[in-house]
Amino acid sequence: MTAFRILSISAHGALEMLLGLLALVAPFALGFGLAGAVVTILLGVVLVGLALSTTDSGVRLSAHYAMDYGLAVGAAAAAVIIGLAGDRAALLFLIGLALSQLALNVSTRYSTRG
């Protein structure tokens, strides 16, 4: 399983920052409804915060690991709820965000070593 964990925690943080910034811009660029925009912006803010926490030694890596998986599950749940509300663009974006976060989680070495 560790053979697939090719990203260092710093690379993980950089990619997480990119995902967060993308989530902050997407509602305006893709024309989400109000609920989809609010949820996506909130997830973007959380992602940026998580990305910034990778450079701070005050946050344990095990806590960051748990928050990453929580965010992926939360984004998937939000996608379902927003999809039921009828916002197809936000649904597709949030599913992509959840899958991207999950792929990032699976490919990251949650270790300070190398």
Stretch-by-stretch model annotation:
Residues 1-7:
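Short, Lys/Arg-rich, polar N-terminal cytosolic tail immediately upstream
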Residues 57-63, 86, 111-114:
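A cytosolic-side transmembrane-helix exit/cap motif
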Residues 2, 40, 54-55, 108, ...:
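Residue-identity detector for threonine
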Residues 33-41, 87-94:
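Short, aromatic-rich membrane-interface segments at the entry and exit
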Residues 8, 12-32, 44-54, 68-85, ...:
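Extracellular/lumenal glycan-associated surfaces
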